[in-house]
Every structure is written in structure tokens, then in C-alpha cells.
């Protein structure tokens, strides 16, 4: 939800305005505009490093942010410890946004939701591959094998080059799928032993998501070779077009 980043941004803006208000509170009215401009220049000079006018969606900004010493927290497990940092807790409490207990509870809830969501996705992926996709894969392999055998029976010197080529690729994909399924299942079982919420979320990010990508690759490769009639669910092209 955009509500969460907006809470953080609005709290940060409130703190900045509060600091500005404190600095200008005792300034004489006739000098207010001049002092305000001086303060703006000072703040701009101090915080210019966060201003970037290039393309923020490319690696250009990533490299520039690193050069400027700015955070680049790419995942929730990397980012969540920041919410518990002392200065951030004090900021939320100062503006009556969250109490320390509320911050700690949100920390645990966000991490738990993150881990549970990835677990559900991983289990769903395993079910789709094991119960549905592999059936279609093996059925098509069987059909190709039967076709090659029948051609050989009719034409003894038939090379069956196409069937052999596809079968070779499907066999390699099938082997990779089997190994990837085993690894994902094994690593999912290992996550059940982790009790710390941050360590668990980190394991789901670093290991389970990587396992899912590793499983998807051979499935996608095989899917490109399998006719739609053998697939138990619509392909991307069918869903999109």
C-alpha cells in the first residue's frame, strides 16, 4: 500500500517544517522573508545530495546514490531494520505517529507478511509444476516418442530429427525442473527451522526467491516447445492477447 511510504514521507516533512519553524520563530516580521531565504539556501546546500534530475529508473541513479552515500535498500528484509533505528523511533514518537510498541509490532507484522506471502507463492509454484505442468510435459514427450517409433516402423531409415531434437531439449528441461523442485522443497523445509523474523524474511528473499527463479527458467524453456493442448493453463500470450 502507498499508505506506508506516505506515512514516512509525511512524518519526515513534518519534522523538516518543525525545524524550520523553530529557526524562524523569533525572527522579526520585517526580516522574515530575508531570513527564510537564507535558511532555504542553507538547507538546499546541506541536502543537495538527495536531489537528482536524471533518470531515476536506470542504473545511473543507483551509481550516483552510492557515490553520494545514500541508502539503496533493495528488499524489505534490508529495509526493515531502519524502522527500528533509534533516531527513527524518536522521530515517529515525537510527532505522535507511532509509539515504540507500535513500531516494533509493525516491524514483526511486515516481516511475517513478507515471509508468508513468498511461502504461499513458492508452494503454489510447486503445486502447479508437480501436479499440472509435468503431466503436460510428460504427455508431450510420450507423444513425440510414439511418433518417432511409428515413423521408424513405417520408414526404417527415418531420421526423426525434429522429434529427437525436441525430445533432447525437453529431457534436459525435465531434468532441470526435477532438480529445481527438489531444491525448492528442501530449502522451504529449512525455513521452518528459523525462528527470528528478520532471518526468516532474509532466507525467503535470498534463497527461496532464487530457487523459484531457478525453477521458472527450465519451465519457461519447456513451455515454449509444448503445444497449448498439452498445457493445463493458459500461456502468457493467451492471457495478454
For the regions a language model picked out, list residue spans one by one.
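Single-stranded nucleic-acid nicking/binding segments centered on His-rich, glycine/basic loops
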Residues: 40-44
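An acidic, glycine-/histidine-flanked metal-binding catalytic module
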Residues: 1-36
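C-terminal amphipathic alpha-helical interaction region
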Residues: 46-241
